[in-house]
Amino acid sequence: MKKLMLLGLAVSLFSTAGLEAKTVQKAKKQSPSTSFELNVAHINDHHSHLEEEKMPLKLNGKTVTVHIGGLPRVAQAIKNFRQGNKNTLVLHAGDALTGTLYYTLFEGKADAELMNAINFDVFTLGNHEFDDGNKLLKSFLDVLKIPVVSANVVPDKGSILEGKWKPYMIKNVGGQNIGIIGLDVVKKTKESSSPGDDIKFLDEVETARKYVNELQGKGINKIIIVSHSGYEKNVEIGEKVDGVDLIISGDTHYLLGKEFEQFGLVPEKEDYPKKVNSPNGNPVYIAEAWNYSYLLGQMKAKFDKNGVITELIPTPKVLIGDDFFEVKNAEGKAVQLDAKEKNAILNSIKNNKNIAAIKNDPALAKLLE
């Protein structure tokens, strides 16, 4: 473990980060309905894995151990994404908490500070947010300054969690109003975590349908669900609920897309994203971004004037470092690649849309020294 003065430093450095991100319930006046392009980036299930980790990948014909993930690297990747695209949304599909010593020591506050610095547009609750009860979740949310949505998790009046999240938000992006609904997995949260008795959990499919209808009643025709309900349940929602365009999934930790086999990984036998049809025949896309901040999901969605996605261009990327490439020599000893081999790998990465060699964001990396 590196310096554990993280929180004090983070609070002073990022106390105002994310304050401009507000949960909007009243739709702003939007531009006349025309074709529209939206760029979405997302992660899920980072589980307090704040630092980069080591992992062997197959790169340029070699098995090479690299640094992968870490929120400082995610921060830099998201910064690049926002700078390189217009009309962006950056989403977190839940389970920020539990999994490393950072959670044990800081009880979610370290996660919240780094998430604030990244300035996600939306976060939805996952089952592990409830692992240590309402009080700890409240302390996490007290520090978190980004909008939180969860439509099927309803605190009773008087609960310490009352008012800590909304069922959805409406965000104006590039002159168009986007409805973003949050969902959590019901059965697993109730049976395996520790929510208080003053928290009600509602059916995922019926809740999605209710709030899609409410958003459509407000004139919203572009609707995203950020859902920690698990991949299979999210596919079910896509197939049963009209009006949904995109579901950003969490909980199941799925790496989607056979393209990742080239790196020696074993993805699920599903596309990134999976396309299904809603009851009215319109396309719905379901995407999940593996876990532990190893991968940044990315896609460009093109909507027609009726809010239907006519084209979706996916570019999910495994996030690795650019300065650590370790192999075993003839004696079985771990050594760094020489400069020529390293440059060959970096050049191969530049030409591959599904992996990125990215430096850590300096400010966030400094917090973890």
Which residues fall in each region the model found?
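Low-complexity, intrinsically disordered regions enriched in charged/polar residues
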Residues: 7, 40, 44, 68, ...
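Acidic, metal/ion-coordinating pockets
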Residues: 21-323, 330
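Bacterial N-terminal signal peptides
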Residues: 8-15
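Preference for short coil/turn "hinge" residues that link or interrupt alpha-helices
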Residues: 12, 111-113, 351, 357
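Positively charged n-region of N-terminal signal peptides that target proteins for export
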Residues: 1-4
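A short C-terminal boundary segment appended to hydrolase-like catalytic domains
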Residues: 294-369
